[in-house]
């Protein structure tokens, strides 16, 4: 019931949950929008420690296919955004503005790459873009790198 209300809402609220409940609810909401591979999670401890992570689990079957030399199209966006979140927080804590700016530019490079039509297979399957291309994990990361380097 709550999931339906959250999905249909326009936002503007805070949904406080205990750790396990938040994990389950966030996964269900993310799945309703298409892909867990786009969702990150931030855990904050009472003593001020932070952990940034991709909310999805491991992709063991993709890894085994990769080891066999087969084409894989694993979406790294949540992992990249977990790193950028951690980099930004480190920059804030240590007052390193350049690190915060780099994190933002890397995130924008990811978004721009997808908006340009270059994406992994999971996004390709849901995208309504006309000029889109499904690429391997390595090709996607290379495209992000090229976009980032052009904007540094």
Provide a role label for each language-model segment.
Residues 68-74, 89-152:
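Internal helix-turn-beta structural module
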